[in-house]
Amino acid sequence: MNILLICAAGMSTSLLVTKMKEAAKQKGIEANIWAVSADEAKSHLDQADVVLIGPQIRYKLAAFKKEGEARGIPVDVINPADYGRVNGAGVLDFALRLKK
């Protein structure tokens, strides 16, 4: 599974990406997880199975949902509590539920 995280600059999600990769490994899930800035995101959408947006750019959800729907890719906002706590396992579970 390919999980794309989008945030304002692509840096604030880097620790979350690390925690999500650790959680995937512990659960035996093969996942490619990466983060990019909102400006770079469009060029990465075709590689993703799920797109998660950082809460700080939730105002861009409608635009990214439209792009995702055109490609058959679910798009949603990361829960602010999970994002703030860097809950990699929780965000990974959310991504898996979106893909089902």
UniProtKB/Swiss-Prot annotation:
Cell location: Cytoplasm
EC number: 2.7.1.205
Primary location recorded for the protein, binned into one broad class: cytoplasm
Positions bearing Phosphocysteine: 7
Pfam family name, one: PTS_IIB
Keywords: Cytoplasm, Kinase, Phosphoprotein, Phosphotransferase system, Sugar transport, Transferase, Transport
Catalytic activity: D-cellobiose(out) + N(pros)-phospho-L-histidyl-[protein] = 6-phospho-beta-D-glucosyl-(1->4)-D-glucose(in) + L-histidyl-[protein]
Domain PTS EIIB type-3, residue spans: 1-100
The keyword Cytoplasm appears for this protein: yes
First-level EC class: transferase
Cellular component terms per the entry's GO annotation: cytoplasm
Catalytic residues identified in the record: 7
GO biological process terms held by the UniProt record: phosphoenolpyruvate-dependent sugar phosphotransferase system
GO molecular function, one term: kinase activity
Primary role: The phosphoenolpyruvate-dependent sugar phosphotransferase system (sugar PTS), a major carbohydrate active transport system, catalyzes the phosphorylation of incoming sugar substrates concomitantly with their translocation across the cell membrane. The enzyme II CelABD PTS system is involved in cellobiose transport.
Free-text note on domains in this protein's UniProt record: The PTS EIIB type-3 domain is phosphorylated by phospho-EIIA on a cysteinyl residue. Then, it transfers the phosphoryl group to the sugar substrate concomitantly with the sugar uptake processed by the PTS EIIC type-3 domain.
UniProt xrefs under NCBIfam families: pts-lac (TIGR00853)
Protein name: PTS system cellobiose-specific EIIB component
Lineage: Bacteria, Bacillati, Bacillota, Bacilli, Bacillales
